UniProtKB/Swiss-Prot annotation:
SMART domains, per the entry: REC (SM00448), Trans_reg_C (SM00862)
Keyword annotations of the record: Activator, Cytoplasm, DNA-binding, Growth regulation, Phosphoprotein, Repressor, Transcription, Transcription regulation, Two-component regulatory system, Virulence
Organism: Salmonella choleraesuis (strain SC-B67)
Protein name, as recorded: Virulence transcriptional regulatory protein PhoP
Gene responsible for this protein: phoP
Described purpose of this protein according to its UniProt entry: Member of the two-component regulatory system PhoQ/PhoP which regulates the expression of genes involved in virulence and resistance to host defense antimicrobial peptides.
Length: 224
């Protein structure tokens, strides 16, 4: 079973995809626009995304490029009515992993999804080890004492950034930039909320506070 994010502005096609995927045993988040796609991506941590190019608020290729520039590595399957070879090259160059040309059979979508997941699972794992903390960069997972801590995508991004800078203060602005590359979307209180949630989740597995607030400077990850 996979968690699938479907980003398709055509309501009938979006519903058809959602029903077919659910009937195949998958969990599905479906939306018509890029803004809500970002929300589902960050909060529900899908395994794969199916993205149409003609979205109402942002071009699908732009959305994929933005994800890739933020180091979001989940497999992306594009739905496109563009059949020219130049269009297909542009789709793959944007960071998409594969594409299906409209009109299509749902069986082809399912087969390409499965192929992408098999290919993605074969990638070599990259791990940062600061015992007892471990960050799996491929899976985007944080483990403490070999127990995986369930984090949202935003929480994981914060934690990875802090651990990469182990022993160094990371400014609030730097963390906000990791979460919100678009300055217009930044919310100053978000970091404080995320830090509070992170501390609670970590302390359930590790009794010491490893995230320190350095007044006027930022946040510090350090084992004591």
């Amino acid at each position: 079973m996979m968690r699938v994010l479907v980003v398709e502005d055509n309501a009938l096609l979006r519903h058809h995809l959602k029903v077919q995927l659910q009937d195949s045993g998958h969990q599905v988040d479906a939306t018509e626009d890029a803004r809500e796609a970002d929300y589902y991506l960050n909060e529900h941590l899908p395994d794969i995304a199916i993205v149409d190019l003609g979205l109402p608020d942002e071009d699908g290729l732009s959305l994929i490029r933005r994800w890739r520039s933020s180091d979001i590595s989940l497999p992306v399957l594009v739905l496109t009515a563009r059949e020219g070879w130049q269009d297909k090259v542009e789709v793959l160059s944007s960071g998409a992993d594969d594409y299906v040309t409209k009109p299509f059979h749902i069986e082809e979508v399912m087969a390409r999804m499965q192929a992408l997941m098999r290919r993605n699972s074969g990638l070599a794992s990259q791990v940062i080890n600061i015992p007892p903390f471990q960050v799996d960069l491929s899976r985007r997972e944080l483990s403490v004492n070999e127990e995986v801590i369930k984090l949202t995508a935003f929480e994981y991004t914060i934690m990875e950034t802090l651990i990469r800078n182990n022993g160094k203060v990371v400014s609030k602005d730097s963390l906000m930039l990791q979460l919100y590359p678009d300055a217009e979307l930044r919310e100053s209180h978000t970091i404080d909320v995320l830090m509070g949630r992170l501390r609670k989740k970590i302390q359930a597995q590790y009794p010491h506070d490893v995230i320190t607030t350095v007044r006027g400077q930022g946040y510090l990850f350090e084992l004591r």
